[in-house]
Amino acid sequence: MSLLSDLINLNLSDITDKVIAEYIWVGGSGMDMRSKARTLSGPVKDPSKLPKWNYDGSSTGQAPGQDSEVILYPQAIFKDPFRRGSNILVMCDAYTPAGEPIPTNKRNNAAKIFGHPDVAAEEPWYGLEQEYTLLQKDVQWPLGWPLGGFPGPQGPYYCGTGANKAFGRDIVDSHYKACIYAGINISGINGEVMPGQWEFQVGPSIGISAADELWVARYILERITEIAGVVLSFDPKPIQGDWNGAGAHTNYSTKSMRNDGGYEVIKKAIAKLEKRHKEHIAAYGEGNERRLTGRHETADMNTFVWGVANRGASIRVGRDTEKAGKGYFEDRRPASNMDPYVVTSMIAETTILWKP
């Protein structure tokens, strides 16, 4: 095993200029992540300089067998925390050979929204809070929970420490450092209310970069849990009963909101979001109805409510924002399995471009 470990950690930069590029894309379910690697003749820092590539879309649920070729377009580059050196992770989106985005390519439409002059002028910032649950591999039961049983009730686990409260911290810290190494703007981590559940935050990041970074952070976490022999779940309600679900709270601001008088802009934006509540809920993640029940720090999905410092609201405004008269707000509706390309661009579209 020591030889295998040595080979895994082999530093190729001592002997060659060649680098390995791991191309990453979103699979057919809209949540599964796929990747494959190729050799490049030398380091590349601009995604437009990377070659397009193809894959078998019939094996990912993204193309029929008789016309299975799907084309990957490189969009964002990150340092590879697994191979290190000059090796890279490449976030891609997927197109038909004719150049049309495939149905599961949500990045293409997001890029159009973020590229709109009115949106670009507002410089939308996002802070994405990604909750997730770690499961024991063979039984699909949360890490640290007794087999076939339940731990003590919620209370001591949120930001808790100790062997009977925090389960999987090595995975969480490894992921934190790996994201920083990769160049992802990860801003923090914490243990969540349900034992075995954790959260990391990405941002503040501007526009589509926030979604690129969250997808790659998810990919890195998936790879780390693979190494650890633990299953990663983004199910918005992994355990039924008196246990918190998992969300992806989305913090958002525009230049107008961050400037003096921004609180009035925030209130107008929230009024727009209320008018399109059903459309947003429909796009905010599969199975979210099991989470948005009005309990466990959520608002009922059929009701829109906003408030200051209210974690039972659809939209929460922080007390600092209210006091300063400018700042940001938090959309608490997105589920943990949401597509960040969809959610971030939809919030921008509704609050900046949409005319009621």
Curated annotation (Swiss-Prot):
Keywords, ordered alphabetically: ATP-binding, Cytoplasm, Ligase, Nitrogen fixation, Nucleotide-binding
Family annotation (Gene3D superfamilies): Glutamine synthetase, N-terminal domain (3.10.20.70), Glutamine synthetase/guanido kinase, catalytic domain (3.30.590.10)
Domain of life where this protein originates: Eukaryota
Expression by tissue: This is a nodule isozyme.
GO terms for cellular component: cytoplasm
Catalytic class of the enzyme: ligase
Name recorded for this polypeptide: Glutamine synthetase cytosolic isozyme 2
Subunit record text: Homooctamer.
GO function term, MF aspect, one: identical protein binding
Entry's family note: Belongs to the glutamine synthetase family.
Chief place of localization: cytoplasm
Pfam family membership, one: Gln-synt_N
Cross-referenced PROSITE patterns: GLNA_1 (PS00180), GLNA_ATP (PS00181), GS_BETA_GRASP (PS51986), GS_CATALYTIC (PS51987)
Gene Ontology BP term (one): glutamine biosynthetic process
Catalytic activity: L-glutamate + NH4(+) + ATP = L-glutamine + ADP + phosphate + H(+)
EC annotation from Swiss-Prot or TrEMBL: 6.3.1.2
Cellular compartments annotated: Cytoplasm
Domain GS catalytic: 106-356
Residue ranges of every copy of the GS beta-grasp domain listed in the record: 19-99
